[in-house]
């Protein structure tokens, strides 16, 4: 059985619902040997363009962990694989890799530094060229005094959509009986010149687990969404906007509601959009009673739109008809997965019905469990710039996978955009072994999808008006909401093997990363236009 990881997303499927063979072809590269099978995994696609594709591979043990930058040419042959792990330093003067970011023209290895003698934590940035050359010394983007390493500042980052701006946010060390503080800095990535910096006093009691979300626009303007728990089920919210470092604060009133799950994007008009779900009273898991929409004008930084409303009855009904469990009523138990900006300034929000169950392994002397991960339907909402709902739809599906791992390594679906059309890819684990077509003939799954296919990878398309396009009749297949991607599956397949962590929107196709059993060999291909 092969393992499949989708690692980028953009697919032009011409007339995909007009014919059963409307699937584009797949171009596969040559198989490549994995030099450290079992200890080496591709974890991130950084970029893919006419110059080639770049990926990060992690390998080694916890105490000897390495990061490799890999380049692949247009035919998906490996050009090089080079270690870009910065020097970890020595005891009392160390660098720990926090995150690896792709910016315009290079790669940034973001490290948390600690200097015991100075009692300072720092944000250290190592620049890496696209040829794999690592800078000998880091750019020290920020420093903060701390009593000890475990109590030093925490650093968070964001890169603008065009890769030209970087922000670093230092969550400054907790101090008892003091107010919470942070420091936000913006850099131009070409020269790594600091454009502006701002010290933030949030004017609320310091918290050991603060809740701040950051984002930066192509202009270098930045935003911080602040959530503060004041008391049991009592929260305060504020939006901090920064234009050239000048700060503007707006209190966001969401009375008697817990803004429990939210995401932020910069829409195509340059405005900030915040969207999420709320719960009233005690919040449990992903349950929500409604949604919160906020849009901040990209120029004036004023809150241009805000809408707080319960889920509509028709939406609850549509979701409940295809849900995998839970109680009916006004609560929708779903996970907020993605928010995607559209070309007209609207955004798409995607939610999924997820559940995890575990059962003790019979006869085991230690605490061992078997896990069942169930993923149900996807609820898709399109929101206008004023927060009103343009349309909604539900992608009905049922996926179940059983494993001994308490961590779900792969997600249940991935997405791509083709103009204003949304493409949803998922591994269909609910296909019968055999069925009858319209003529009464018996058909077998392996005769249609191939013996190597455990579960077919399927595609659903939702057009710009919210209409879902599936397959009216595919060999009499009962699951009519997805087009099985036969050519896509020919190279590699594995149940529910869609990994958004390595899902990258390229300009001219879907890049597929296929790993063989035992991780000894792998190959990369592209689902072409």
Language-model features and meaning:
Residues 251-262, 308-328, 389-413, 453, ...:
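Conserved blade-ending motifs and adjacent loop-strand segments that build the rim/top face
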Residues 41-50, 96-105, 153-164, 212-219, ...:
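Structural signature of eukaryotic scaffold interfaces centered on beta-propeller domains
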Residues 31-67, 165:
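Beta-strand-rich domains and repeat architectures in extracellular enzymes and scaffolds
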Residues 77-118, 141-151, 201-210, 251-256, ...:
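Blade-loop segments of beta-propeller domains
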Residues 336-357, 361-362, 369-371, 375-379, ...:
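Loop/turn-rich, solvent-exposed surfaces of beta-rich toroidal or solenoidal domains
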Residues 50-62, 99-118, 164-177, 220-229, ...:
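Short beta-strand elements that form the blades of beta-propeller/WD-repeat-like
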Residues 68-74, 122-132, 181-192, 235-246, ...:
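Beta-propeller blade signature
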Residues 1-25:
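Bacterial Sec-dependent N-terminal signal peptides
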């Amino acid at each position: 059985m092969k393992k499949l990881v989708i690692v980028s997303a953009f697919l032009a499927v011409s007339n995909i619902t007009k014919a059963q063979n409307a699937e584009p072809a797949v171009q596969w590269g040559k198989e490549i040997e994995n030099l450290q099978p079992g200890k080496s995994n591709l974890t991130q696609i950084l970029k893919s363009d006419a110059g080639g594709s770049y990926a990060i591979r992690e390998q080694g043990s916890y105490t000897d962990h390495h990061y490799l930058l890999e380049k692949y040419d247009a035919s998906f042959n490996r050009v090089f694989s080079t270690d870009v792990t910065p020097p970890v330093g020595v005891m009392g003067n160390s660098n720990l890799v926090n995150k690896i970011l792709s910016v315009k023209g290079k790669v940034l290895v973001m490290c948390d530094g600690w200097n015991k003698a100075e009692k300072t934590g720092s944000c250290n940035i190592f620049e890496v060229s696209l040829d794999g050359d690592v800078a000998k010394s880091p750019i020290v983007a920020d420093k903060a005094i701390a009593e000890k390493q475990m109590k030093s500042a925490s650093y968070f980052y964001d890169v603008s959509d065009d890769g030209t701006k970087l922000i670093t946010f230092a969550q400054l060390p907790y101090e008892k009986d003091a107010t919470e503080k942070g420091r936000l800095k913006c850099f131009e990535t070409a020269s790594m010149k600091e454009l502006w910096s701002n010290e933030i006093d949030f004017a609320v009691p310091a918290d050991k687990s603060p809740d701040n979300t950051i984002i930066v626009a192509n202009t270098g303007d930045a935003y911080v969404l602040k959530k503060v728990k004041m008391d049991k089920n009592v929260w305060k919210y504020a939006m901090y906007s920064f234009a050239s470092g000048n700060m503007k604060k707006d209190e966001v009133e969401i009375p008697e509601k817990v803004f429990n799950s939210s995401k932020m994007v910069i829409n195509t008009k340059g405005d900030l959009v915040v969207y999420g779900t709320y719960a009233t009273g005690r919040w449990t898991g992903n349950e929500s009673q409604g949604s919160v929409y906020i849009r901040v004008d990209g120029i004036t930084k004023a809150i241009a739109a805000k809408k707080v409303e319960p889920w509509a009855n028709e939406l609850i009904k549509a979701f409940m008809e295809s849900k995998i469990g839970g109680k009916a009523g006004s609560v929708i138990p779903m996970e907020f997965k993605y928010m995607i900006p559209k070309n007209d300034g609207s955004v798409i929000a995607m939610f999924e019905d997820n559940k995890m169950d575990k059962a003790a392994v019979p006869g085991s002397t230690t605490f061992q469990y078997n896990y069942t991960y169930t993923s149900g339907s996807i609820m898709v909402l399109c929101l206008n710039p004023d927060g009103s709902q343009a349309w909604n739809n539900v992608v009905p599906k049922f996926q179940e996978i059983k494993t001994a791992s308490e961590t779900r390594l792969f997600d249940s679906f991935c997405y791509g955009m083709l103009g204003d059309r949304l493409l949803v890819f998922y591994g269909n684990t609910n296909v019968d072994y055999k069925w009858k077509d319209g003529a009464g003939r018996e058909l077998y799954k392996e005769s249609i999808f191939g013996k190597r296919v455990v579960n077919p990878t399927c595609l659903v398309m939702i057009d710009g008006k919210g209409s879902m396009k599936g397959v009216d009749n595919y060999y009499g297949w009962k699951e009519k909401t997805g087009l099985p991607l036969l050519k896509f599956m020919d190279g590699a397949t594995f149940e529910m093997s869609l990994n958004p962590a390595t899902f990258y929107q390229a300009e001219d196709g879907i890049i597929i990363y296929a790993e063989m059993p035992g991780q000894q060999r792998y190959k990369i291909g592209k689902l072409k236009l």
